[in-house]
């Protein structure tokens, strides 16, 4: 079964080989909230969602955060453990209004459009398992996405910053 977000962009043979090295979750259904944590549901249970926290400082300073493929080689294995959350086909409930979509590099390892919440791009940690504690938090890098998290200001907004 092909995931709808991958079917919309044809994969070249080379890109298909690159993608096969990294598992891609295709069983994502809807959003849910557990406590204050935003999660995505799967047939086996919910998975926690994460945000990349350095993005806020980059946006406030007018800088661009590169895709993982553009990072130094020694950082890629760490970054590839986080999968950009694909745009979900249908989302219901009170938090659907905060969802958005951002395009990604169509030539990269993860070419699908990415789901955002309050402007924050959302990520899955590839080693998390439904029903178990979240394992992908890394202080000052990846934090659990909370429903009360202030929205990420658009790039170039005046009046924000350190």
Describe the function of each predicted region:
Residues 1-162:
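Compact beta-sheet-dominated domain cores in extracellular/mature segments
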């Amino acid at each position: 079964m092909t995931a709808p977000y991958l079917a919309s962009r044809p994969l070249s043979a080379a890109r298909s080989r690159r993608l096969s090295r990294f598992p891609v979750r295709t069983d994502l259904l809807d959003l849910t909230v557990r406590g204050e944590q935003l999660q995505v549901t799967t047939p086996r249970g919910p998975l926690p969602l994460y945000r990349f926290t350095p993005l806020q400082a980059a946006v406030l300073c007018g800088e661009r955060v590169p895709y993982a493929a553009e990072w130094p080689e020694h950082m890629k294995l760490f970054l590839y453990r986080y999968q950009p959350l694909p745009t979900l086909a249908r989302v219901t409930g009170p938090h659907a209004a905060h969802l958005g979509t951002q395009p990604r590099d169509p030539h990269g390892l993860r070419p699908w459009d990415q789901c955002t919440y309050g402007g924050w791009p959302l990520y899955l940690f590839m080693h998390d398992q439904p029903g178990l504690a979240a394992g992908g938090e890394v202080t000052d890098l990846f934090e659990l996405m909370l429903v009360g998290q202030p929205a990420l200001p658009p790039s170039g907004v005046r009046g924000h910053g350190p």
